[in-house]
Amino acid sequence: NPGDTCYFDSSIPHGMIAVGGEDCEFYAIVLNPTGASIPELDPMRYTPVAREMKSKTERPGIWQKWIDIETSGTGTPTKIEFKNTENFNFAFDVVDEIGKTQPEKLAMLHLSSDKTERRITFADMMKESARCANYFSSLGIKKGDRVMLILKRHYQFWYAMIGLNKLGAIAIPASNQLLSHDIEYRINTAEISTIICTSDGECADEVDKAAPSCPSLVNKLIVGKKREGWRDFNEEYPRFSSSYKRSKDSPKGDDLLLMFFTSGTSGYPKIVAYIHKYSFLH
């Protein structure tokens, strides 16, 4: 209400918005416990500028296929309904859609451990994930197969993850701190067929220790340095087509998307599964 006062710790990220359709001015007052003057905080005059509400036809968004919003006469949302969720697939309906309509839009700014900067657009993400989907398919990976990803913060994680989303294989992200017995348990419990692993540290060593006791494991892919007995992900996946078409059998809605293992604090880790609608809620 007009005249209300709110005290808060400004070191915590925050924001303020006006609702109800009326113009509003916010006054921010910094309370300085030392009592000393702060020249940078001299009173400044603020002239509010009226913002014009844009209609859906002026600024269409990919969300309109999935969400209906009712608003009041002042443009304030009053009701939200979701639709078509049974068909939703994040890789096709968000990543690829933006890749087609806004190809140069930045999807991710990645800074590697050696300070190499990569600016990855949605067009890049669309094409590289398609290459991954085609690559994985060539290895015999299919819809419903389980694939473990131990990739730390490598940018290849996102190419592989979205490629698996398109293919319909179930991604199982895992920590690079797992030891051989942890890996063996997860592979056998989830019947994992493929593992994509970083060459950093001793992760691949731990996988190789576990592999002989894991009959379901067929493919081992390494990201980074080459390793005997492993397929070279960085070298092989770029050879494949950057186009991957959606089909009537492509994963969607209630199909499985992800599996995570719990921490196992009170017993053996358990599988928590998520469907494609999970990413829709984000």
Task: Report residues per predicted region.
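Structural core segment of the AMP-binding/adenylate-forming
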Residues: 54-58, 138, 162, 166-235
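Conserved AMP-binding/adenylate-forming core of the ANL superfamily
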Residues: 104-162, 179-184, 235-238
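A short N-terminal helical cap/helix-turn-helix that marks the beginning
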Residues: 53-68, 84-108, 127
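Ligand-binding loop in jelly-roll beta-barrel domains
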Residues: 10-36
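Short acidic-glycine-tyrosine-enriched beta hairpin
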Residues: 2-9
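Conserved pre-ATP/AMP-binding loop-to-beta segment of ANL
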Residues: 103-106, 222-231, 238-261, 268
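AMP-dependent adenylate-forming
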Residues: 71, 94-121, 225-228
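Conserved AMP-binding A3 loop
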Residues: 118-123, 257-281
